[in-house]
């Protein structure tokens, strides 16, 4: 399939069965509510021990729903690979198992990303530069206050320290963003491999996932990512503008649209992978 066909099919797919999308929407909203509830209630355990239990229960429920949703995403990816136009049904056991496998893949890629970013942080010495900047500011304030140095010398010293910190921070952020983009694409390929082979071992083969991306076409994959980002950015901009005038209506549309886009992206992953399946 070409890029236009993939984008069109993916973003129309959730609307092909509104009843199943409604179930997915309710699950997504419930998960969000329980995450927010658990996050807000749990810290209050400092004042009332019962809040620890309540917050923990909320978060566990959110985790269970998250497993189920992730497993359903796997079925949507599989429908794209098989070019099946029917929106998948919800199956309790299969969705939970799929969600567990997707979670393993997510943790696997998170560990790799965290390691690479940690190396980047050490290489750029961003924390060391941050500490050095704070120390330099305190030192120069002391020097100026007790007239050890002039204000000009203090400003120059602080400026150099701040500059070094900003450069190291900028490099670290750039590396983190690039790593996140690359491994997000690799993770999507691994999820597609899982949907296609039903093998977690095959899905975790990062080198084969990379080969799959090359077979699909790196340019094609990057264009799909870029188009999705553009679509989301345009919609987000429109929402931000309209929110000032119609906050309630925009909030409702946002709640409906975020799960819709999430489902469309899973379909897009499957369709892109269908070329080599």
Where are these regions (language model features)?
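Interfacial aromatic "cap" segments that immediately flank transmembrane helices
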Residues: 2-33, 90-115, 183-236, 273, ...
């Amino acid at each position: 399939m070409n890029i236009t066909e993939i984008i069109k099919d993916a973003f129309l797919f959730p609307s092909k069965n509104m009843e199943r999308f409604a179930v997915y929407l309710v699950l997504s909203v419930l998960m969000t509510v329980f995450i927010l509830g658990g996050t807000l209630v749990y810290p209050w355990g400092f004042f009332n021990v019962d809040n620890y239990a309540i917050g923990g229960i909320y978060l566990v429920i959110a985790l269970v729903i998250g497993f189920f949703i992730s497993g359903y995403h796997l079925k949507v990816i599989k429908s794209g690979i098989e070019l099946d136009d029917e929106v998948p049904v919800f199956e309790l056991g299969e969705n939970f198992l799929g969600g567990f496998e997707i979670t393993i893949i997510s943790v696997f890629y998170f560990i790799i990303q965290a390691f690479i970013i940690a190396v980047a942080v050490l290489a750029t010495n961003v924390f060391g530069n941050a500490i050095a900047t704070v120390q330099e500011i305190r030192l120069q304030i002391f020097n100026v206050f007790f007239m050890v140095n002039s204000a000009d010398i203090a400003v120059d010293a602080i400026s150099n320290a701040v500059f070094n910190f900003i450069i190291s921070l900028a490099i670290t952020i750039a590396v983190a963003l690039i790593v996140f983009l690359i491994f997000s694409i690799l993770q999507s390929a691994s999820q597609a491999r899982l949907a296609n082979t039903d093998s977690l071992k095959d899905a975790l083969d990062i080198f084969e996932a990379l080969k799959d991306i090359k077979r699909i076409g790196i340019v094609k994959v990057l264009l799909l990512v870029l188009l999705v980002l553009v679509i989301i950015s345009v919609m987000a901009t429109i929402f931000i503008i309209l929110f000032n005038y119609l906050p309630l209506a925009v909030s409702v549309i946002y709640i409906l649209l975020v799960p819709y886009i999430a489902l469309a992206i899973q379909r897009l992953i499957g369709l892109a992978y269908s070329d080599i399946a």
